């Protein structure tokens, strides 16, 4: 009995202790919660995102105005090789007067300029005369030479109405037909491309006939030029009749009322008579469509060939009755002076002169500009 009471008492005491402990813990928990509530609320920190450091915008390059170089300047640059390798050697030659030794040096220099034997002979006769007068300096010699060469070229150049060569829209409403001839390698195809480009730039309508049907590469090259210029090109299968292509090109030009019809031609060696006859046939077939065509027949001459070009020119002239010349590649030759004797001997004017690869490097030939660029005169 006593044992039962003792056991009950122990249980009651244990429960009481447990309740007290739980109550104490609950009170402490409330106290802790109250303390936490009384604490200042912490501010929420936004995550820190570093701003991307933008590199400063690159300074805008200053707008470069397109510098348009005049053809006169292009001509000076283009003829620099002839000027430096030949005429530049005049420096110092006249100091102390012209003795016989210096006269011989001057004569050799003039022959090297490729202006022609007859021209040099006549020139030296006058130089001897002026030297005796004792008033021949480097500057006065250049002026004398300028006047002398101009007198040789001007009578031929002035025979021609140079308005024919200007890059203008037709003012007559009639298609102008230009036939371009020359040996392979002289620069015919490139020259035609430049002519077409310059004419199109001035607003003229142009039809080009690719009559050199035996050189596919030349036809493709011409096609590129025409596509860029916006000119119409008439071509045929490789090996087609060249005169037939010329006829078709002129027919297309007339149908379109184009300002110009420019015809490329075969460029085999001038010694092949049958090929020269082929050119004559190409010329004559055009007259079926226009009795006055072609209005110009221009021979392209590579300046590098110098005096050797005379033989070529004579053969072409005899067959086709040329109306003028186009002097090309003057920038790559020291023989640009050969233009003087070629003009004088053939009695044919130079229509255009080329001094580089672009269309801007081809322009109407002007005697004064040419001679000043050749001799290094302002």
Model-based region annotation:
Residues 118-121, 146, 150-378:
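P-loop/Walker A NTP-binding module and the surrounding RecA-like catalytic core of P-loop NTPases
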Residues 1-152, 156, 161-165, 173-174, ...:
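Non-catalytic terminal/linker segments enriched in charged/polar, low-complexity residues
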């Amino acid at each position: 009995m006593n044992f039962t009471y003792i056991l009950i008492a122990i249980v009651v005491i244990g429960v009481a202790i447990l309740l007290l402990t739980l109550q104490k813990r609950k009170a402490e928990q409330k106290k802790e919660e109250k303390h936490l509530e009384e604490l200042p609320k912490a501010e929420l920190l936004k995550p820190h995102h570093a701003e991307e450091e933008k590199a400063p915008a690159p300074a805008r390059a200053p707008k470069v105005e397109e510098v348009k170089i005049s053809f006169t300047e292009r001509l000076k640059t283009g003829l620099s090789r002839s000027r430096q390798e030949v005429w530049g050697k005049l420096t110092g030659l006249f100091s102390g007067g012209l003795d016989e030794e210096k006269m011989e040096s001057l004569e050799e220099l003039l022959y090297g300029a490729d202006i022609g034997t007859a021209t040099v002979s006549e020139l030296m006769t006058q130089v001897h005369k002026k030297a005796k007068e004792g008033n021949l300096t480097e500057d006065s010699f250049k002026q004398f030479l300028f006047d002398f060469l101009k007198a040789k070229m001007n009578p031929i150049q002035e025979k021609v109405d140079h308005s024919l060569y200007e890059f203008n829209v037709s003012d007559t409403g009639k298609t102008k037909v230009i036939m371009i001839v020359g040996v392979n390698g002289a620069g015919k195809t490139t020259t035609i491309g430049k002519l077409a480009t310059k004419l199109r730039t001035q607003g003229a309508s142009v039809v080009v006939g690719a009559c050199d049907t035996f050189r596919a590469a030349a036809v493709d090259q011409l096609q590129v030029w025409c596509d860029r210029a916006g000119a119409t090109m008439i071509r045929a299968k490789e090996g087609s009749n060249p005169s037939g292509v010329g006829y078709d090109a002129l027919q297309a030009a007339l149908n379109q009322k184009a300002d110009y019809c420019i015809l490329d031609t075969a460029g085999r060696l001038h010694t092949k008579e049958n090929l020269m006859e082929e050119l004559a046939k190409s010329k004559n077939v055009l007259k079926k469509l226009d009795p006055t065509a072609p209005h110009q027949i221009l021979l392209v001459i590579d300046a590098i060939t110098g005096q050797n070009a005379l033989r070529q020119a004579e053969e072409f002239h005899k067959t086709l009755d040329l109306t003028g010349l186009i002097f090309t590649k003057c920038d790559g030759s020291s023989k640009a002076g050969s233009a003087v004797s070629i003009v004088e001997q053939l009695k044919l004017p130079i229509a255009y002169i080329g001094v580089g690869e672009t269309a801007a490097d081809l322009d109407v030939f002007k005697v004064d500009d040419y001679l000043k660029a050749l001799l290094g005169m302002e």
